[in-house]
């Protein structure tokens, strides 16, 4: 088992005006999220979110972070959200085991001492996408089946953005310290997500793109200030960090899905500032 946690630092809007393609990708793109038998994480200084992939195969896996976070165990002062995008597996949370099929989620509160990830079949391993944010209070652990996710249809075919937003961890459904998490699925024939664009200065957000309709599907993710945008070309199962001052939207060559996760000082999902189309540059 390999464990690796990369670090991404925070940037001001002025910084990326001078980034070339290579530098932009180095600072905001996570090219490898899932690798069989490994735990691959990224720590971003944007609201101190940790995110990444856990892919157990023959053996179960456990995230063990202590010195890196100045704590005795990983979730001593953090909460954790999980969504499985792979084969069937399970999570053991302080001794309580829960089956996790594809699209199932889980919320794990501060103070949980042990979280163990396992796959039912090593040849078709579970792929657990995990997101952790700082916490100040313990909220109950809760399995989040896909069937219970709050579905919100958005967009239309005329604007190439017909999609459904599935809210797993959302303040309207459950209490957390700051974590919000869910995923969005675009319908065939649609390619745009989160367009018209918006910003939310009180929260940062990560996008992890996956379930591309075709092997050669690519997504161009847009970020930056509305009047100073940049793009990053993404492959399947890659993630991008969006600072709170940045737009975050994308367009694909076919349809796709992405997991979004947010944290910051405001949990109101609709607390956002819409960007008029004529202001985009």
UniProtKB/Swiss-Prot annotation:
Give one Pfam hit by family name: KduI
Identify the EC number(s): 5.3.1.17
Report if keyword Transmembrane helix is assigned. no
What are the alphabetically sorted keywords of the record? Answer: Isomerase, Metal-binding, Zinc
Superkingdom: Bacteria
> What SUPFAM superfamilies does the entry give?
RmlC-like cupins
Pathways per UniProt: Glycan metabolism; pectin degradation; 2-dehydro-3-deoxy-D-gluconate from pectin: step 4/5
User: In Gene Ontology terms, what is a biological process of this protein?
Assistant: pectin catabolic process
GO terms of molecular function: 4-deoxy-L-threo-5-hexosulose-uronate ketol-isomerase activity; zinc ion binding
Metal-binding: is it a keyword of this entry?
yes
Annotated residues that bind Zn(2+) are located at: 198, 200, 205, 248
Q: Which CDD domains match?
A: cupin_KduI_C (cd20491), cupin_KduI_N (cd20294)
Reaction catalysed by this chain? 5-dehydro-4-deoxy-D-glucuronate = 3-deoxy-D-glycero-2,5-hexodiulosonate
Q: How is the cofactor bound?
A: Binds 1 zinc ion per subunit.
Q: Which family does it belong to?
A: Belongs to the KduI family.
Question: According to its UniProt entry, what is the function of this protein?
Answer: Catalyzes the isomerization of 5-dehydro-4-deoxy-D-glucuronate to 3-deoxy-D-glycero-2,5-hexodiulosonate.
Under NCBIfam families, the record lists: PRK00924.1
**HAMAP family, per the entry:** KduI
Entry protein name: 4-deoxy-L-threo-5-hexosulose-uronate ketol-isomerase
Instruction: Name its species.
Output: Lacticaseibacillus paracasei (strain ATCC 334 / BCRC 17002 / CCUG 31169 / CIP 107868 / KCTC 3260 / NRRL B-441)
Ranked from the top, the taxonomy reads: Bacteria, Bacillati, Bacillota, Bacilli, Lactobacillales
